[in-house]
Amino acid sequence: MSEKNPIVGLCQKASFLISAAQVDQCPPDEGLEVAFAGRSNAGKSSALNTLTHANLARTSKTPGRTQLLNFFALDDSRRLVDLPGYGYAKVPIPLKQHWQRHLEAYLSSRASLAGVFLMMDIRHPLTDFDRLMLDWAQASQLPIHVLMTKADKLAFGAAKNALLKVRREVQQGWGDVATLQLFSAPKRQGIDEAQMVLAQWLGLLDEEQEAFEEA
């Protein structure tokens, strides 16, 4: 994005709002919010921190640490949501089932939810959890943008081939709601593209256009 990056400026003002174990504990369903989801150890926290230029999520080498829906306020009407990491073997099955039940309820009922970023490890894409997230997004006609994370773990050609392969399958099954791209937090690859999606979902591009037209 341009030097006048609206996302960076907004996220510098971000503050922790609340953690919720279930939908009825979430903040009032108004304004706009964007959620970040991903199977445990898919690089979700690193992606969230990198995109926002803020340490909004605790980056940990122990997957499954985030077990609640964590809301961050950007301003009075915009929020980011860090969703629980799923699939780690050390997490008890009843807890996984609890997460799944309340995550589905959140995705299907939250009117203020403008879109979801789904992190997939490029070396292990389209897991059962990934497919479930895509199915839920499609059922709710909710935009979902896939970040194929850890792209730096593969050679450039191999990463491109992996992207094309996954893109074909995603377009066939969920093409009406899903888009995807390569992403690497350490190499800062794909940040501008992802930030553009985030800015659009949060209505920041509309505000810039209105300001331009009024000038």
UniProtKB/Swiss-Prot annotation:
<comment type="function">
    <text>Necessary for normal cell division and for the maintenance of normal septation.</text>
</comment>
<comment type="similarity">
    <text>Belongs to the TRAFAC class TrmE-Era-EngA-EngB-Septin-like GTPase superfamily. EngB GTPase family.</text>
</comment>
<keyword id="KW-0342">GTP-binding</keyword>
<dbReference type="InterPro" id="IPR019987">
    <property type="entry name" value="GTP-bd_ribosome_bio_YsxC"/>
</dbReference>
<keyword id="KW-0132">Cell division</keyword>
<feature type="binding site">
    <location>
        <begin position="149"/>
        <end position="152"/>
    </location>
    <ligand>
        <name>GTP</name>
    </ligand>
</feature>
<feature type="binding site">
    <location>
        <begin position="182"/>
        <end position="185"/>
    </location>
    <ligand>
        <name>GTP</name>
    </ligand>
</feature>
<feature type="domain" description="EngB-type G">
    <location>
        <begin position="30"/>
        <end position="204"/>
    </location>
</feature>
<feature type="binding site">
    <location>
        <begin position="82"/>
        <end position="85"/>
    </location>
    <ligand>
        <name>GTP</name>
    </ligand>
</feature>
<dbReference type="InterPro" id="IPR030393">
    <property type="entry name" value="G_ENGB_dom"/>
</dbReference>
<protein>
    <recommendedName>
        <fullName>Probable GTP-binding protein EngB</fullName>
    </recommendedName>
</protein>
<dbReference type="InterPro" id="IPR006073">
    <property type="entry name" value="GTP-bd"/>
</dbReference>
<keyword id="KW-0547">Nucleotide-binding</keyword>
<dbReference type="GO" id="GO:0005525">
    <property type="term" value="F:GTP binding"/>
</dbReference>
<dbReference type="Pfam" id="PF01926">
    <property type="entry name" value="MMR_HSR1"/>
</dbReference>
<dbReference type="GO" id="GO:0046872">
    <property type="term" value="F:metal ion binding"/>
</dbReference>
<feature type="binding site">
    <location>
        <begin position="38"/>
        <end position="45"/>
    </location>
    <ligand>
        <name>GTP</name>
    </ligand>
</feature>
<feature type="binding site">
    <location>
        <position position="45"/>
    </location>
    <ligand>
        <name>Mg(2+)</name>
    </ligand>
</feature>
<keyword id="KW-0131">Cell cycle</keyword>
<dbReference type="InterPro" id="IPR027417">
    <property type="entry name" value="P-loop_NTPase"/>
</dbReference>
<dbReference type="GO" id="GO:0000917">
    <property type="term" value="P:division septum assembly"/>
</dbReference>
<keyword id="KW-0460">Magnesium</keyword>
<feature type="binding site">
    <location>
        <position position="66"/>
    </location>
    <ligand>
        <name>Mg(2+)</name>
    </ligand>
</feature>
<keyword id="KW-0717">Septation</keyword>
<feature type="binding site">
    <location>
        <begin position="64"/>
        <end position="68"/>
    </location>
    <ligand>
        <name>GTP</name>
    </ligand>
</feature>
<keyword id="KW-0479">Metal-binding</keyword>
<dbReference type="GO" id="GO:0005829">
    <property type="term" value="C:cytosol"/>
</dbReference>
